[in-house]
């Protein structure tokens, strides 16, 4: 990234005078930290993003780095302790203005993460990576569902909290109702262009059930999680829908058919009412 590129992501920054350190050099430690954060949580090591994705990634890195750096940019360490750099006739920004700037930069990070994740999720090569498998670990739609969820924290923290509840829901869903094979088959259907309409429909149904579960348990932290009675009511329509797709039903019955098959009652006691 060049200094000019960096400046294009941060409006209203005064240009350096001759001999002054470039802005990109001032931000270097924070840029490296932000890049490591983005790589570790989203892109993964060794993956070369396409140009569209790379532009989003650069914007996120710059905004996150600048938000982290802002409180320190006008401070210098002197022999007598920390001092504020002279503004040379410019009025120093108030604490409130700086806080609004930092909040705006963090908002920009959160606004650009969802489209970046969707670009990644629609890339088969990235989906096969370990970080890709992490983001395919639930039926939530990338970061979009976390973005719409009521929250008071940053987007990634909100997503992780929702993901924990989603995994509890999915554990019961897999072990008691769907089985491992069908779960794996359906979880990628939201992003796989080769998924059948039936697979995409079931993925969407499970996604909505999962979000209802998360919404309830987010608002009532004392509620039992997982609540098996609640899960059954959420998953019952999914089980019924499976019956309409012969191909999916075959996969499901091969693993779960015997577990969910209800044997008719038979009286084994000999007597006048024996049948």
Annotate each predicted stretch with a short phrase.
Residues 1-58, 72-275:
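Conserved short "hinge" loops at termini or chain/domain junctions
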Residues 61:
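Catalytic-loop motifs flanking and including active-site residues across diverse enzymes
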């Amino acid at each position: 990234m060049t200094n000019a590129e960096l400046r294009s992501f941060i409006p209203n920054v005064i240009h350096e005078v001759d001999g002054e350190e470039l802005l990109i050099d001032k931000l270097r430690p924070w840029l490296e930290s932000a890049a490591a954060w983005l790589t570790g949580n989203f892109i993964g090591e060794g993956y070369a993003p396409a140009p569209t994705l790379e532009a989003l990634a650069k914007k996120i890195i710059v905004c996150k780095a600048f938000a982290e750096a802002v409180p320190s940019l006008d401070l210098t360490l002197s022999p007598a302790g920390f001092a504020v750099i002279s503004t040379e006739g410019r009025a120093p920004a108030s604490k409130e203005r700086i806080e609004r700037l930092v909040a705006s930069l963090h908002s920009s990070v959160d606004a650009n993460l969802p489209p970046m994740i969707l670009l990644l999720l629609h890339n088969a090569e990235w989906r096969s990576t370990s970080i890709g498998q992490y983001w395919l670990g639930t039926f939530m739609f990338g970061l979009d569902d976390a973005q719409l969820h009521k929250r008071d924290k940053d987007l990634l923290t909100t997503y992780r909290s929702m993901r924990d509840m989603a995994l509890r829901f999915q554990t019961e869903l897999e072990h008691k109702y769907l089985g491992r094979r069908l779960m794996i088959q359906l979880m990628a259907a939201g992003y796989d262009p080769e998924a059948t309409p039936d697979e995409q429909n079931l993925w969407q149904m499970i996604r909505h059930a999962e979000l209802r579960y998360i919404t309830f348990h987010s608002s009532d932290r004392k509620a039992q999680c997982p609540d098996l009675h609640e899960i059954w009511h959420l998953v019952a329509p999914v089980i019924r829908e499976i019956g309409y797709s012969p191909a999916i039903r075959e996969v499901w019955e091969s693993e779960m058919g015997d577990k969910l098959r209800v044997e008719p009652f038979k009286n084994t006691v000999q007597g006048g009412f024996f049948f």
